[in-house]
Swiss-Prot record:
One of its GO terms (biological process) is transport of virus in host, cell to cell. TGBp1, TGBp2 and TGBp3 seem to act together for cell-to-cell propagation. TGBp1 is the main movement protein that physically cross the plasmodesma with the viral genome. TGBp2 and TGBp3 would facilitate TGBp1 function. It comes from Strawberry mild yellow edge-associated virus. The lineage of its organism: Viruses, Riboviria, Orthornavirae, Kitrinoviricota, Alsuviricetes. This is Movement and silencing protein TGBp1. One of its GO terms (molecular function) is ATP binding. Transports viral genome to neighboring plant cells directly through plasmosdesmata, without any budding. The movement protein allows efficient cell to cell propagation, by bypassing the host cell wall barrier. Increases plasmodesma size exclusion limit. Acts as a suppressor of RNA-mediated gene silencing, also known as post-transcriptional gene silencing (PTGS), a mechanism of plant viral defense that limits the accumulation of viral RNAs.
Length: 229
C-alpha cells in the first residue's frame, strides 16, 4: 500500500523532495492540487479507513471510510490535515496537509509536494503569489476587483473579517464565514474584504478565500473607492 501510494503521488505530479524517508511520509499540497483525490483513491482501492484531524462534517472531501482522529495515529494510518494534530502521529504511514490553509504547530518538512492547482486559474495564481505563496495553475479564470457600493455580488459570498461580516449582516446579505467556506468550492464566488491591499490581511484566511472558486472570483474591497490610497 505504501509503494502504491508513492507511485500514485508521482503519477499525479507530486514532486519528491530531498528529505530522506524516515517515519511517516509527509505530503503537502496547495488547494486544488488533488490531495483529497489521492487519499480517496487509496481508501477505495484498499478499503482503508482514513483519518482527519478535522470534524468529519468539515472534511474537505467525501470519503466512504473517513473518520475523525481523536487519539494517537494507528500503525499504517493515513492522516489528513495532520498539522493540526495534538497527538502522536509517529506510527502513521502517510501524513497529508496544506499548512497554508490549515496552519498548525505540527507541520513538518514534506517528502512530497505539489504547488500546482487544478481548481484555480492563472489570474488567481498570480494574485496568490503576490501574498508570497508559491502557487501554480494553467487554466484560464476570471478575477475582478470591484467597488462594493456600485456592484452586485455573484455566486457564493465569502467574508472572514469581523467588521466586514458585520457590515454585510447590517445589509441583510447572506455570506459564509471562514469555517463555513474552508474546504469547499463553487464556480463563482464574491469575496468582501476591508482593503484592496490583500497583503495587509491575515494570510491564511486570504489564501483560503482566494481558492474557493474554479471559474470566477469577484473581490469587493470597501476601500476600492478611496483614491487617496
Amino acid at each position: 500500500m505504501v509503494e502504491f501510494t508513492k507511485r500514485l503521488l508521482l503519477e499525479r505530479n507530486f514532486e519528491r523532495t530531498n528529505r530522506p524517508i524516515t517515519g511517516p511520509i509527509v505530503v503537502h499540497a496547495v488547494a486544488g492540487a488533488g490531495k483529497s483525490s489521492v487519499i480517496n483513491t487509496v481508501s477505495l482501492t484498499f478499503q482503508l479507513i482514513c483519518w482527519t484531524t478535522l470534524p468529519e462534517e468539515k472534511a474537505s472531501f467525501n470519503c466512504l471510510h473517513l473518520r475523525h482522529l481523536d487519539g494517537p495515529a494507528f500503525p499504517g494510518a493515513f492522516v489528513d490535515e495532520y498539522q493540526l494534530a495534538d497527538t502522536d502521529l509517529s506510527e502513521a504511514a502517510f501524513l497529508f496537509g496544506d499548512p497554508l490553509q490549515y496552519p498548525g504547530p505540527a507541520a513538518q518538512v514534506p517528502h512530497f509536494v505539489k504547488l500546482f492547482s487544478h481548481r484555480c486559474g492563472l489570474n488567481s495564481a498570480s494574485l496568490i503569489r503576490e501574498l508570497g505563496i508559491a502557487f501554480e495553475a494553467s487554466k484560464l479564470d476570471s478575477v475582478q476587483h470591484l467597488d462594493p457600493y456600485s456592484s452586485d455580488p455573484e455566486g457564493t459570498i465569502l467574508a472572514f473579517e469581523p467588521e466586514v461580516q458585520a457590515a454585510l449582516a447590517s445589509h441583510s446579505l447572506d455570506f459564509l464565514c471562514l469555517d463555513e467556506f474552508r474546504g469547499k468550492q463553487w464556480p463563482v464566488c464574491t469575496l468582501y474584504v476591508s482593503t484592496k491591499n490583500l497583503c495587509d490581511l491575515d494570510r491564511p484566511s486570504v489564501y483560503v478565500a482566494l481558492t474557493r472558486h474554479y471559474e470566477r472570483l469577484l473581490i469587493m474591497s470597501f476601500d476600492a473607492a478611496d483614491t487617496s490610497a
